[in-house]
Structures are given as C-alpha cells and as structure tokens.
C-alpha cells in the first residue's frame, strides 16, 4: 500500500510539473540561424546568406519547414518569417536565386515596416511579447 502511495504521489508531482511548464510558443520559436548558416552560402556581397538556385517561395518554405515561423508575410519580392526574437527576410538576388537575412525583431520590424504594417506587433508597444524572459510581457 505504501508503494502505491509513493508511485501515485510521484505521478501526480510529475503531472503538476508538466502542467507548470513554460509556454512552448515562447520558448521554442527561435529563428533557425545555425541551420541557415549550414544550409546556405555566405553572401559575397552585402549581408546574409544566398541560395543561388532557388526562388524566394521555395527558400522561405525550406526555412519554415525546418523551424515553423510564428507568422509569414508573402509578397512578390519578399517573404518575411516572424520568429520569437527575429525576422528572417528572403529577397531576390539580381543574378537569380535568393538572399536570406536575419535581423533581430526590432531591427527587422523597422526595416520592413512598410511591408509589415500593423500585421505584426510594434516592438515599442505593450502588445509585443518577444525579447526573451520577462521583457514586454
């Protein structure tokens, strides 16, 4: 009987700890920076990384397939992938292919604000929940 109580208490404690875990959306949505560095070549001009063969939608789909973005904005000349603390932009290369650039959320938001509009939260507002533990929450 004593063993049953110990097992029962252990199971209940494990369930309670699991229920108190952090929000997966906040903790597990970092931009796949390491994967991007491994998958694509460093740009020889400008910044970021390049895929000299694939077009914007295919590259954005590859990145999103590796690590799902919180949200995505698509246009003819850019794909923006929103992650917890970063924005990944996929734009065309003049010679064909795509350029991939990773900005922290605030920099990316300011850079792409004309495309983002009011779709994503302004990092200066109280609605923004990025930036890591305890910030903006």
What is each stretch, according to the model?
Residues 1-8:
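Bacterial N-terminal signal peptides that target proteins for export
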